[in-house]
């Protein structure tokens, strides 16, 4: 197990904990992007990165106010020399079917299609062993991390299939290959997310859909606020790392990446340069081998 974990973490030799020059020049002019969990942390950073890359329209989805994110995105776009994007803010709970259906309907009526969907909304839940906390709190993590991604994907796929990029990025966790005690709701839900992503990739590949899972790095956010202080030294990555990484990876359709699990700590140009090796060896898939 330890060998497999090490092989995955070090699959790409060059690694990063912050954004770097090679991924800061993505081009998203003409693209429409939707992001869940966009009000803070990684979601906000992803939105700002797309803004800086000239995205034409951005759909920000969250339960909390998004006015600050909207203004930050527009400022980043203008500062980078682009025309201000159309930024649509949608108040929605991804785990509520009616809420996300109404959100998708609003987006359809306003924009008609999307090119890229980033399922970033997530929940960690109570830190502690299986006896800690309440059962409802434990299950709520699955409601957000699995049901929420399912409902959002289900609602937005028709619009994605009308777009150019037809790409879904689901935010995963390194814990699926390197288990951590006291996260019995969060980590299994992220493992299930990988399989869900793979199934979506299989079901819609003939229609041109690309779907992959990305580990964003260890970024300190509101989600990690319940972690013990002893965990703090592990959170060494900036939100800008996943923000710029996702924008860079999705500027082109990477069909060969569909159904795979990648780390955004990896040097992405180096990762892409190994496409043939990855495809021929069927690498970067989370499977059981006996």
Swiss-Prot record:
Keyword Isomerase: no
Alphabetized UniProt keyword annotations: NADP, Oxidoreductase
GO biological process: terpenoid biosynthetic process
Segments traversing the membrane: none
Family: Belongs to the short-chain dehydrogenases/reductases (SDR) family.
Pathway membership: Secondary metabolite biosynthesis; terpenoid biosynthesis
Lineage: Eukaryota, Fungi, Dikarya, Ascomycota, Pezizomycotina
KO phenotype (gene knockout): Impairs the synthesis of anditomin but accumulates andilesin D.
GO molecular function, one term: oxidoreductase activity, acting on the CH-OH group of donors, NAD or NADP as acceptor
CDD domains linked: SDR_c
Top EC class for this record: oxidoreductase
Residues of the active site: 186 (proton acceptor), 190 (lowers pka of active site tyr)
Annotated Pfam families: adh_short
UniProt function note: Short chain dehydrogenase; part of the gene cluster that mediates the biosynthesis of anditomin, a fungal meroterpenoid. The first step of the pathway is the synthesis of 3,5-dimethylorsellinic acid (DMOA) by the polyketide synthase andM. DMOA is then converted to the phthalide compound 5,7-dihydroxy-4,6-dimethylphthalide (DHDMP) by the cytochrome P450 monooxygenase andK, which is further prenylated by the prenyltransferase andD to yield farnesyl-DHDMP. Further epoxidation by the FAD-dependent monooxygenase andE leads to epoxyfarnesyl-DHDMP.
Record EC number: 1.1.1.-
Name of the protein in question: Short chain dehydrogenase andI
Residues that bind NADP(+): 35, 120, 154, 186, 190, 219, 221
């Amino acid at each position: 197990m330890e060998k497999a974990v090490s092989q995955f973490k070090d699959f790409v030799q060059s690694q990063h904990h912050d954004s770097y020059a090679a991924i800061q020049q993505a081009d998203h002019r003409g693209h429409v992007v939707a992001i869940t969990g966009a009000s803070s942390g990684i979601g906000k950073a992803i939105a700002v990165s797309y803004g800086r890359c000239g995205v034409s329209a951005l759909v920000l989805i969250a339960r909390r106010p998004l006015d600050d994110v909207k203004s930050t995105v527009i400022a980043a776009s203008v500062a980078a020399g682009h025309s201000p994007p159309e930024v649509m803010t949608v108040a929605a709970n991804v785990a509520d079917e009616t809420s996300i259906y109404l959100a998708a309907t609003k987006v359809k009526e306003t924009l008609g299609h999307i090119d890229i969907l980033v399922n970033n909304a997530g929940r960690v839940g109570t830190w502690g062993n299986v006896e800690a906390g309440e059962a409802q709190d434990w299950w709520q993590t699955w409601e957000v991390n699995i049901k929420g991604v399912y409902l959002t994907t289900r609602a937005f796929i028709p619009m994605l299939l009308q777009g150019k990029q037809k790409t879904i990025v689901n935010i995963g966790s390194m814990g699926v290959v390197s288990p951590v005690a006291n996260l019995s709701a969060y980590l299994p839900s992220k493992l299930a997310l990988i399989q869900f992503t793979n199934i979506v990739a299989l079901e819609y590949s003939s229609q041109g859909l690309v779907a992959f899972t990305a580990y964003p790095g260890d970024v300190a956010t509101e989600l990690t606020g319940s972690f013990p202080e002893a965990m703090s030294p592990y959170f060494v990555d900036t939100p800008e790392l996943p923000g710029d990484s996702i924008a860079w990876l999705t500027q082109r359709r990477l069909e060969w990446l569909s159904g795979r699990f990648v780390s955004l700590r990896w040097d992405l140009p180096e990762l892409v340069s190994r496409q043939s090796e990855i495809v021929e060896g069927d690498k970067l898939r989370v499977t059981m081998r006996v």
